[in-house]
């Protein structure tokens, strides 16, 4: 009866330590260590009763030339910008992590794309945060018929595993990974160990049975995925939802994509009946701009392979104190300092006494 050993995981970055620490040595977060009981190595060996020979017989190996692959084998939606971010559509067996602040529109967008994916087969929506009635209510507001979309209010990954393997839906949406747990482990849902183990199970199902997954992940105050950084390395693509609550638009940014280009962005607007993609985002961003405005300029910005036209505004006033102020929003402050110095030195603009 060997006792289980305790280790500590940082809830911010997943750093593992044998003893508790007030500050994480890897990411610098304070009071982020959580105690997790791990099974001793001897017990793991004892529980693994399957012989090496039988395990080897179950392993499938393919010769490179015999692997079948269809380049057009992607699920597409009615949202061209969303498909562009995925590299032309969702591949079979692909695992996509969608992150963002709570309430920014992750669940809404995924419910809308689920309405498109149902044309290829059954779509399973697993929710640990909302009841089926709440999801149905939101779906009706989004004008979703619901035929072919199944809702599952389950949080145990082992039960989810059995159901998905038996029914084999084409696409599965998990909302969210922080609510799932593995009942064979002692730790509660949301801990780094649980998030890692549940994601491993999801990736296993996806690759073994060619089932595509979307995983919703919450982010911390500093913009990182809540849970181990390892989570981002385990999935095929990471999309991050950006935008302030006061803005009508949302930006979906591709931060990682094994099957497409990274740093691509798609722009959506928040409407009464859900998310609406903005194809001509430059026109949208400049719609309220007045021409011949002093201190206003339109500049092209490259994001991935797409060019956006954005407005840059500047305001210069006499400084009332000896040290002039430099207030910057949406731009790197150090670069503004360099540009100001260049303008003063080379263009002879007296900005040294201007705010």
Language-model segments: residues:
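Short cysteine-rich clusters marking metal-coordination/redox-active sites
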Residues: 10-13, 24-27
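Loop/turn-to-beta-strand initiation segments
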Residues: 122, 148, 168-171, 209-214
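Conserved P-loop NTPase
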Residues: 25-33, 39-68, 165-167, 171, ...
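Conserved nucleotide-binding/hydrolysis micro-motifs of P-loop NTPases
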Residues: 102-104, 129-133, 141, 155-159, ...
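The Walker A/P-loop phosphate-binding site
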Residues: 50-142, 161
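Flexible beta-alpha connector loops of hexameric P-loop NTPases
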Residues: 72, 147-154, 182-196, 324-333
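Terminal-proximal interaction/regulatory segments of ATP-powered molecular machines
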Residues: 332-355
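Substrate-engagement module of ASCE P-loop NTPases
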Residues: 193-214, 218, 234-245, 344
């Amino acid at each position: 009866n060997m006792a289980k050993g305790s280790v500590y995981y940082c809830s911010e970055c997943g750093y593992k330590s044998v003893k508790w620490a007030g500050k994480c040595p890897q990411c610098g977060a304070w009071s982020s260590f959580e105690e997790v009981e791990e099974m001793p190595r001897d017990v793991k060996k004892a529980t693994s009763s399957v012989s090496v020979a039988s395990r080897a017989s179950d392993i499938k190996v393919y010769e490179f030339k015999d692997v079948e692959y269809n380049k057009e084998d992607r699920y597409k939606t009615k949202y061209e910008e969303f498909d562009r971010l995925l590299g032309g559509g969702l591949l079979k067996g692909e695992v996509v992590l969608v992150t963002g602040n709570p309430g920014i529109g992750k669940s809404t967008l995924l419910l809308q794309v689920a309405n498109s994916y149902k044309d290829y087969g059954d779509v399973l929506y697993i929710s640990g945060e909302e009841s089926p009635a709440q999801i149905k209510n939101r779906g009706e507001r989004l004008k979703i018929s619901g035929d072919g979309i199944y809702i599952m209010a389950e949080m145990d990954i082992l039960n989810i595993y059995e159901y998905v393997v038996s029914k084999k839906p084409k696409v599965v949406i998990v909302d969210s990974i922080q609510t799932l747990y593995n009942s064979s482990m002692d730790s509660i849902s949301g801990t780094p160990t649980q998030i890692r183990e549940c994601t491993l199970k999801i990736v296993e199902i996806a690759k073994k049975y060619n089932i595509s997954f979307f995983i919703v992940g919450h982010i911390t105050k500093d913009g990182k995925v809540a849970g181990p950084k390892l989570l981002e390395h385990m999935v095929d693509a990471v999309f991050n939802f950006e935008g302030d609550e006061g803005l009508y638009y949302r930006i979906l940014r591709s931060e990682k994509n094994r099957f497409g280009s990274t740093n691509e962005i798609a722009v959506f607007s928040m409407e009464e009946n859900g998310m609406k993609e903005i194809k001509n985002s430059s026109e949208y961003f400049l719609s309220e701009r007045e021409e011949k405005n002093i201190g206003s300029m339109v500049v092209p910005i490259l994001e991935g392979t797409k060019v956006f036209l954005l407005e840059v505004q500047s305001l210069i006033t006499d400084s009332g104190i000896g040290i002039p102020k430099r207030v910057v929003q949406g731009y790197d402050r150090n670069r503004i300092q360099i540009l100001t110095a260049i303008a003063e030195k080379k263009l002879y603009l007296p900005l040294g006494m201007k705010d």
